[in-house]
Amino acid sequence: MTQAEHMARIIEPGTPMQKVIPPRLVEPYLAGRRSVIAGYVYRTMDCAFRGPADFYRVLNLGYEGSDFTAELAEIYVMRWRAMDMDASLAPPLADGAAGLARPSVPEFYTLPIPVPVGAEIHRIVPGSEEFIARYDGQSWLRPSRGR
């Protein structure tokens, strides 16, 4: 790994991170029935995409058994600020997610960690995104209850 590649893989505390949430897990998160983040995560700065199709294509979300399809009208992401990611990151697979070609953005695989206080869920549609809720450490607060 070159020095530039190594630097591209560093996650400093406070780095904005995000995880694409499979459609079947959005409601369990919002209802408080799911309280961990695990799997492939990305730095938010590496994922300035225009809509669900870009997420699907660039992040290789069409792996075998995936809930994602190229035709999704919306996609949900969870965003949070990294804390000590060294303790939760596992080495990336040599060939990318589920054996597909590596995404064109750095990907990180996190072992299960609790959803951090202040994490947010956003809904992304082509050309725009909508804030859905923020985690206060006990529940997800939606805009009508204060942001």
Where do the PLM segments sit?
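Catalytic toxin/effector domains delivered as secreted proteins or via bacterial secretion systems
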Residues: M1-R147
